[in-house]
Amino acid sequence: MTTTQKLQKRLNDSKAMRWTALIIVSFTMMMAYFFTDVMGPLEAPLTTKGKIVYFDNGTYMSADALMNVCPSIASEGDIAVGNTYCTEIIGEDGNTATESLTVSSTINGLGWSNGDYGIFSGAYGYINVFLLMLFFGGLILDKMGVRFTGVMSTALMFVGAAIKWYAVDNGFSGEMFGLPTQVVIACLGFAIYGMGCEIAGITVTKVIAKWFTGHEMALAMGLQVALARVGTACALFFALPIAQSAGTVSAPVMFGASALCIGLISYIVYCVMDKKLDNSIANQETAGESEEQFKFSDLKVIFCNKGFWLITFLCLIFYAAVFPFLKFATNLMIIKYGVTPDLAGMIPGLLPFGTMLLTPLFGSLYDKMGKGATLMIIGSVLLTIVHVLFAMPLLNVWWFAVIVMILLGITFSLVPSAMWPSVPKIIPMKQLGSAYAIIFYIQNIGLSMVPVLIGNVIAANTNDGTTDYTMPMSIFALFGAIAVVISVLLKIVDKKQGYGLEKSNIE
């Protein structure tokens, strides 16, 4: 039997089978991305002590503030959905007018500080960064394969999500390590979840490389990213309405934990397909077998590769300028651009919807035309422009924020669509799990530290409840400029080393 005849028997040569595998694992990651960002639109109730009251005109205020302007309210318990209150407001002309406000919903706030919220947001990567668990996860992936590692990581996600839900659903008194006990427990859950999510991320990426090498790999990775962004968009759009409907911050967290349980079941279904794929290539020298033959000495191939380190640092800087920004973007829309709280999460929500369409498009272009390094340069330049526009004190209106967010969506599609499919061109399949683990590990340093930095900068630039976002956005713009330099260097190194980043993926 010829080699060609053998190759035709591989399960991943069936277009239907490889795309089915992609859909299943992408669904699991979509559930994960929903949970990752489910707390983003809830910053206001998280950082408000006592009840927070939302009105039918899209505004909100704390119960204490409402009682100050409406002395007839004796206590928080008197505030109920449907009640109408009259408040006096002073117009720009100095005249006093009466405004009627009808309560549309209330949420019990947790009373965290901005610093607490920043620490919590950064907790996602604490275990991965400080205990090196993501790095070890990559070693486990290369030694044990995608089935064992995938089930392990998705189970960790669910356990961490359950702990996080328990923390925000229950009141805790006292402090631990100088922080409120509730914040510490929520951080623990989010850190365990983050460990599982990042290991799941590298596992799914290797799954795609396993099924799509020699096929539409950039398109497949682009579609996986697109579906993940659907999860992010759903979190930004629906987290606050779910919390308002239930009256508690814990409701969307519980919803997200339930979604993760479904994602775990989906991955177990994928494992059946993966076993069949391995069986279909059992008698050949394949990538499936090389996964089980990893040796620690193979790490030298990774550590001595210049192109690998440039992509790693590009990933660190690029994602540090996007994901932490999204965590604070809802309040940016409210405070700087005057968007009502009930709509503020929808503008950042445009970002995932844009990437849903554009990431697969740019991935398909990379598959057919190449120019991966060039795409990364263009995306990094656009990233810098976006954050400069957000930092500048001009056009503080909602439509300008929408335009800039759409531009960020293009940026967020260009770089990942070229960056992730480029790694298998630089690193052999046998070390691919460890390579992705190192990239994700270093990326997590940024995802852990940057939210804390930005949270503290925002706190330092907040007076009387109003925040000046010039400095935080300038920091993000600096990250973009660094990304431009790194991506240019990557193109230069690619030309010297011949990685083929500018060549098409389909031959």
Regions found by a protein language model. Give the residues of each.
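Cytoplasmic helix-loop-helix junction between adjacent transmembrane helices
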Residues: 183, 189-227
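C-terminal transmembrane helical hairpin of 12-TM major facilitator-type secondary transporters
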Residues: 372-419
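Juxtamembrane intracellular "pre-TM" segments in multi-pass secondary transporters
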Residues: 2-14, 278-311, 507
